[in-house]
A protein has these predicted regions:
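Short, hydrophobic/aromatic-rich segments at coil-to-beta transitions
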Residues: 1-4
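Active-site- and interface-proximal helix/loop "cap" or "latch" segments in soluble metabolic
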Residues: 6-19, 23-83
Length: 83
């Protein structure tokens, strides 16, 4: 199932998620640091939602209180609630 999340406090403008049965199939960040977001997206493909959240939640970007990785964790929590 496809999901869209609007991140807050980061450079990315949107996170597009394809997840089913508790597994991340695909993630795409719109905007943000291209290399970092592509790397995150590639690494989380095929992983359980809860494992991704556990690994990425709380990561900060510089002096910001959040990061694209942390925002992905927040998005995946919402996805898990809807599944």
């Amino acid at each position: 199932m496809q999901y869209s999340y609007t991140p807050h406090g980061v450079c990315s403008r949107a996170i597009l998620i394809d997840a089913e049965d508790g597994i991340v199939n695909k993630v795409q960040f719109i905007g943000g640091c291209s290399g970092n977001t592509q790397g995150i997206a590639a690494l989380v493909e095929g992983m359980p939602l809860d494992e991704v959240v556990k690994r990425l939640e709380g990561i900060k970007c510089g002096s910001r209180p959040t990061s694209c990785a942390d925002q992905l964790a927040k998005a995946l929590k919402k996805v898990a609630e809807e599944q």
